């Protein structure tokens, strides 16, 4: 049931001057941002590395991602309940680790989507993905790609390295394939555990309406 006071969560764009409303795992994770083939990467703290990457990216694209925050919470609280980040494929060198890499030359990459367990599977993932789709379409991006997760299929058919990626899915920010497909993405390069999905832009379907988004964000679970 929506809360009587109306929408209690809201989507905020992440752009230059407003990059601090991040999910904690998004703020600390540098899996995508650091090149694993370059020696000396990650010598600073992960938070400093991530902040530097976001600031650099924000000077080149209008929004680098979106977060969902508790609108009724403490105005000074910086942590978001969920965060999605995206960028040109060349700005995510860590993607080389993925078994279905590289990203197509014409595509931007949805690198990560981090979300609190208490608000998973409530449609918030779709709200964030739709926000990225809309912003990317407005920016003239030809296509979006994303590495999806098939956790239930991961087993003896995958390599040890791929198994480590699956085990680290929450830290990396991988999204279940079923959620990505419900947002309009289709498998582009298949894999038992980590396929690469693609969505050509503009999308040939309607995005969530403002009312639908408001209904999905109308209640923030306690705790």
List each model region and its residues.
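Short coil/turn motifs at secondary-structure junctions
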Residues: 89-91, 118, 151, 204
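Core beta-strand residues in small-molecule sensory/regulatory alpha/beta domains
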Residues: 67-75, 186
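Short, high-confidence coil segments that cap the C-terminus of an alpha-helix
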Residues: 63, 138-141
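Residue-level signal for short segments within beta-strands and strand-turn junctions
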Residues: 70, 88, 199-201
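Terminal substrate-recognition subdomain of acyl/acetyltransferases
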Residues: 1-63, 80, 84, 145-223
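Conserved acyl-donor/pantetheine-binding loop and adjacent beta-alpha core of acyl/acetyltransferases
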Residues: 56-60, 73-116, 160-163, 167, ...
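Conserved acetyl-CoA-binding loop-helix of GNAT-fold acetyltransferases
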Residues: 115, 121-137
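Short, hydrophobic/aromatic alpha-helical segments in well-folded domains
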Residues: 109, 128-132, 184
